[in-house]
């Protein structure tokens, strides 16, 4: 099967969030299943020079953005049995950040059409075009409404994966004609219109032959008003064509047995080496070197979505009452950055905050932590808890989205489970759950059993890739056009 990924970011080239991890790992996993896989993404200025030097110019064309014709260069490189095509346009992609610009609607209207035009130019006649989030959701719509009428595209099917429904690509009505080049009758509640605006995510949802989300629980949650971000009725209409598939992690990159970033490699049969990583982390962060003190960590975007309101309400009291250490790595909203700076000042012997992102340090934190805190308000899938499980840092999470699907609460009677969970989004329950985890940490035989259970499970992309393969095969067998 020929599969074309259309993504706005992709590791190892450029990353702002978890979407890049999926776009980096899933194509490789599908290629290992015998598929012919290509990935198209913008050639951002942020891509490191060593990667740019490996790119070879393949072709160029022009792409319509409304009434204008814009240059589109197509550069190519192959890596891990995947063909990568980089869409080059200095005006749109030579910016100081990937997103957050006044003309993001224009940038990704261009990119969406460029994907389809470039596919023909370089002869990537895919069976499946797999798009991700609002940035490429318009590819699904343009394919259905316009390109499918041409022989090259007539057999192409499309799948949209929703990574985070909160971000939808919402723009003024004139985007319909001025940027997308579509007649204004497309600006209609059964098509692009949502609450008086053009909504790229909605366009993808209604036009894709199938929609996936990044966990089964998140799939069910977004059908409800609380999580549906005003698109729950659209999703309910497509309910039979929406599937939740858990993300995996790249277990060659996140692998404690061979991780070059950590002090001592280890596995579930050699947990003494995990303690070496804990000592090294304490040294690096300037914390007292005490192996018997539980070290709790967070590697996260510092935002309300990640449950940091709850953390802020209980952390002062917890650090005063408990003999623990806390290490935080991340950037985000100023109020939370300032809070963790304050916490480090107020509890200098117990707390350290690295405001920024450092990939080697992230690995060292996973390897050196005893527990990993992730009390998200909502979490479509979450990669942090999967990496933590892989490294034997036991997750403490709220039961939502992919956290509910991947972290099983420890049951003392049966001796089962790989973490600690709570349901209601409130600070009291979070504090109680942390205290419960701390009580089991004191029982070292029990704790080692929990750690081994966590580390011995398979969090790779193998199983998930097979589920995507099944969806793709199902879609290609179907002759139904969802917009008919």
Curated annotation (Swiss-Prot):
It catalyses: [(1->4)-alpha-D-glucosyl](n) + ADP-alpha-D-glucose = [(1->4)-alpha-D-glucosyl](n+1) + ADP + H(+). Pathway: Glycan biosynthesis; glycogen biosynthesis. Gene3D superfamilies: Glycogen Phosphorylase B. One of its GO terms (biological process) is glycogen biosynthetic process. Its EC number is 2.4.1.21. ADP-alpha-D-glucose binds at residue 15. GO terms for molecular function: alpha-1,4-glucan glucosyltransferase (ADP-glucose donor) activity; alpha-1,4-glucan glucosyltransferase (UDP-glucose donor) activity. Pfam families: Glyco_transf_5 (PF08323), Glycos_transf_1 (PF00534). Keywords: Glycogen biosynthesis, Glycosyltransferase, Transferase. It is an enzyme of class 2 (transferase). Induction: Expressed exclusively on media containing carbon sources that allow efficient sporulation. It comes from the Bacteria. SUPFAM superfamilies: UDP-Glycosyltransferase/glycogen phosphorylase (SSF53756). Belongs to the glycosyltransferase 1 family. Bacterial/plant glycogen synthase subfamily. Synthesizes alpha-1,4-glucan chains using ADP-glucose. This is Glycogen synthase.
């Amino acid at each position: 099967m020929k599969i074309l990924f259309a993504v706005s970011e992709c590791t190892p080239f450029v990353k702002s969030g978890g979407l890049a991890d999926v776009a980096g790992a899933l194509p490789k996993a599908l290629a290992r299943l015998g598929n012919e896989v290509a990935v198209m993404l913008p050639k951002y200025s942020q891509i490191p020079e060593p990667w740019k030097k490996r790119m070879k110019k393949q072709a160029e064309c022009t792409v319509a953005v409304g009434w204008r014709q814009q240059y589109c260069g197509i550069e190519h490189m192959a890596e891990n049995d995947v063909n990568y095509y980089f869409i080059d346009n200095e005006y749109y992609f030579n910016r100081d950040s990937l997103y957050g610009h006044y003309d993001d609607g224009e940038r990704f209207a261009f990119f969406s059409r460029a994907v389809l035009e470039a596919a023909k130019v370089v002869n990537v006649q895919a069976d499946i075009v797999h798009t991700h989030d609002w940035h490429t959701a318009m590819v699904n719509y343009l394919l259905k409404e316009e390109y499918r009428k041409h022989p090259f595209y007539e057999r192409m099917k499309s799948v949209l994966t929703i990574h985070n429904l909160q971000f939808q690509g919402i723009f003024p009505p004139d985007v319909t004609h001025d940027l997308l080049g579509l007649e204004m009758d497309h600006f209609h509640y059964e098509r692009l219109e949502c609450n008086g605006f053009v909504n790229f995510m909605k366009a993808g949802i209604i036009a894709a032959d199938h929609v996936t989300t990044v966990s089964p629980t998140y799939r069910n949650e977004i059908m409800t008003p609380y999580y549906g971000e005003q698109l729950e009725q659209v999703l309910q209409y497509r309910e039979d064509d929406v599937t939740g598939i858990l993300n995996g992690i790249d277990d060659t990159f996140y692998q404690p047995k061979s991780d070059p970033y950590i002090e001592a490699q280890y596995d579930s049969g050699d947990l003494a080496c995990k303690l070496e990583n804990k000592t090294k982390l304490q040294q690096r962060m300037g914390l007292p070197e005490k192996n018997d003190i539980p070290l709790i960590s967070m590697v996260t975007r510092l935002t309300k979505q990640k449950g940091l309101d709850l953390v802020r309400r209980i952390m002062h009291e917890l650090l005063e009452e408990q003999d623990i250490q806390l290490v935080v790595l991340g950037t985000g909203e100023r109020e939370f950055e300032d809070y963790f700076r304050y916490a480090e000042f107020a509890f200098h012997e117990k707390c350290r905050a690295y405001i920024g992102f450092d990939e080697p340090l992230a690995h060292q934190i996973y390897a050196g932590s005893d527990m990993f805190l992730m009390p998200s308000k909502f979490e479509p899938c979450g990669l942090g808890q999967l990496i933590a499980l892989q490294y034997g840092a036991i997750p403490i999470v709220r039961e939502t989205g992919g956290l509910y699907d991947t972290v099983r609460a420890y049951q003392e009677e049966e001796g089962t489970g790989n973490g600690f969970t709570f349901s209601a989004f409130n600070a009291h329950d979070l504090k109680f759950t942390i205290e419960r985890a701390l009580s089991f940490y004191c029982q070292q035989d029990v704790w080692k059993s929990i750690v081994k259970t966590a580390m011995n499970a398979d969090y790779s992309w193998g199983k998930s890739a097979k589920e995507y393969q099944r969806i793709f095969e199902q879609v290609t067998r179907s002759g139904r056009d969802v917009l008919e």
